[in-house]
Amino acid sequence: MLLYMSQPQEATSPPLHSVSVAGVVVREDGRLLAIRRADNGTWELPGGVLELDETPETGVAREVWEETGIRVEVDELTGVYKNTTRGIVALVFRCKPSGGVERTSSESTAVSWLTPDEVSERMAEVYAIRLLDALDGAGPHVRSHDGKHLIPAG
């Protein structure tokens, strides 16, 4: 046993997760900020990869600004969502708009303020639930999905 433990191990490292952030930006009238992605045409929350040198709150404010032109005040973490297929863990924060003007970016073809019903109509289940979770006030929620469908907790 000691001989085995003293030998160098050539085990492969387990795959690592990527951490992303997204903002549920809620206007006073209850409408929610969403983007239509340029790469695949889907409606989602503004967000992206968290950079190594920033806090999650700083990262979500940066991503919302870059993708929509809207400045935000970050309120609270409302959910943690793991994409089991791609190894992405998304931290989702409820935010309030604090300035700026809506605009598209290289990552979006449309920026819109949607009602909760429009969110359910336009977004895939795994993205719509993030907005709906942020509105229910019972978070933070922890959920997993395969990129298309939620995976029941268990």
Swiss-Prot record:
Mg(2+) binds at G48, E63, E66, E67. Keywords: Hydrolase, Magnesium, Metal-binding, Plasmid. GO terms for molecular function: hydrolase activity; metal ion binding. The keyword Iron does not apply. A motif (Nudix box) lies at residues 48-69. Residues 15-136 form the Nudix hydrolase domain. Belongs to the Nudix hydrolase family. This is MutT-like protein.
